[in-house]
Amino acid sequence: MEKYSKIEKLGEGTYGIVYKAKNRETGEIVALKRIRLDSEDEGVPCTAIREISLLKELKHPNIVRLHDVIHTERKLTLVFEYLDQDLKKYLDECGGEISKPTIKSFMYQLLKGVAFCHDHRVLHRDLKPQNLLINRKGELKLADFGLARAFGIPVRTYSHEVVTLWYRAPDVLMGSRKYSTPIDIWSAGCIFAEMASGRPLFPGSGTSDQLFRIFKILGTPNEESWPSITELPEYKTDFPVHPAHQLSSIVHGLDEKGLNLLSKMLQYDPNQRITAAAALKHPYFDGLEPIN
């Protein structure tokens, strides 16, 4: 750890404390993520080390680079590239008012990063505004990709805050174990809606409340809209029945093409959800000037 000198604590993330630090040799500013391990006595599981090592190979302009992994007996520290702020802070500072070209640019970059990881068979599983980082050039990069697989997603964060369910796909909320890349598309759709409307689309306070909020907006799913729903562990025949609302009446700030893309991302049936690669070709992005 002598290679890095801490500058300040940036916060407490899902997995541990995050520090801003400086590489003593190069002067480069980095973010150090201290991973808290539940099994203090057992040290770092080798499966986690394997998973993390693979993440060093994920090199893409819209993915936060993992520079280094420092593994001591009881601690694991991940050294990431440093970015100025996350999308949550950005949204708070704008008072939820993001310009339409910025929404389009951020969404395109988010989907580029997701598509790249999905091509490399890496899921995120916990996409939310807090782990989308932005720099002063308007570049957006995804943080924490692949960490869920290495360490699992805890119910509570390092600082005992409850990990948010607002961006969690309904198949996961209903106990699906067979999930794949579509779970990240659902989360990206929720983030898209939040950027456009200035507020979270489904701000639930627990698993049931989360599901019911989704039902109230998108309508309660059934076997017609979602053929395999009855096979899910948490499916109940007595779910409250709600009709579907037009997304345009809830998410203001998106044009027709944007709403069309959003509806394709927020499909109940994971098999019907648009892929990241297909989303990037959607007419909503026509005429976009890419940053990278």
UniProtKB/Swiss-Prot annotation:
The modification Phosphothreonine is found at residue 14. It is an enzyme of class 2 (transferase). Residues 4-285 form the Protein kinase domain. It catalyses: L-seryl-[protein] + ATP = O-phospho-L-seryl-[protein] + ADP + H(+); L-threonyl-[protein] + ATP = O-phospho-L-threonyl-[protein] + ADP + H(+). ATP binds at residues 10-18, 33. GO terms for molecular function: ATP binding; calmodulin binding; cyclin-dependent protein serine/threonine kinase activity; protein serine kinase activity. InterPro entries: CDK (IPR050108), Kinase-like_dom_sf (IPR011009), Prot_kinase_dom (IPR000719), Protein_kinase_ATP_BS (IPR017441), Ser/Thr_kinase_AS (IPR008271). Signal peptide: none annotated. The active site is at 126 (proton acceptor). Phosphorylation at Thr-14 or Tyr-15 inactivates the enzyme. GO terms for cellular component: cytoplasm; mitotic spindle; nucleoplasm; nucleus. The modification Phosphotyrosine is found at residue 15. Its EC number is 2.7.11.22. Pfam families: Pkinase. Keywords: ATP-binding, Kinase, Nucleotide-binding, Phosphoprotein, Serine/threonine-protein kinase, Transferase. Gene3D superfamilies: Phosphorylase Kinase, domain 1, Transferase(Phosphotransferase) domain 1. Belongs to the protein kinase superfamily. CMGC Ser/Thr protein kinase family. CDC2/CDKX subfamily. PANTHER family: CELL DIVISION PROTEIN KINASE, CYCLIN-DEPENDENT KINASE 5. This is Cyclin-dependent kinase 5 homolog. It comes from Dictyostelium discoideum (Social amoeba).
